[in-house]
Amino acid sequence: MTTAQMNDPERDGSAAVGIPVDRTVRLHATDASVLDACCGSRMFWFDRADSRAVFVDRRRERHTLPDVSSKGGSRELVIDPDHLADFTDLPFATDTFALVVFDPPHFERNGATGWVGLKYGTLKGDWQEMLRLGFAECFRVLRPEGVLIFKWCEDEIPVSRILALTQHKPLFGHKSGKQQKTHWITFMKPNVLVTGPPKAGPVEWRVRPHGEQRGNL
């Protein structure tokens, strides 16, 4: 197997994992209404160059993978996001997108080595905290009443453990795959404001009046 890193000097890669984004200096402006927060090779997209979406991943690389079903016995895996960034620290303003797709790595053991890890990524270290931060960031950049589509495969970790990492309540979902292990779950960001300091007495919720300036949720 050969591996070649894809280097593009015109693209900003300093927001890779472990390097915090300074949003006061470097926020990416976008006209896209859809965010794929960890796009990988964009496997489930009908149009992998859809102009309505912006694609983010922490990796930019190319791999040649063995594939007996392909002509020549191999195929190319290309991970080439629009922005190189980590989903725990997204370089976009609050309330930017109408729809966010969140499909994080789901393998902790089986994908640690080999082509599975290259294709899907792997969970490392304190992955529960990583996913908790990922949910929080995806909801931050999502507009009020915007939709978040979350995808998770239960090959190793039950989806119930993952849903416990966000305070947001899912609307509905669907199972897919031969063994019905892949979950597609839909959330909607509430159109509310929270007033008062966190953990300082009861939290007051109120509906945001139509046309009112958006704030951080």
Enumerate the language-model features and the residues they cover:
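Class I S-adenosyl-L-methionine-dependent methyltransferase catalytic core
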Residues: M1-L217
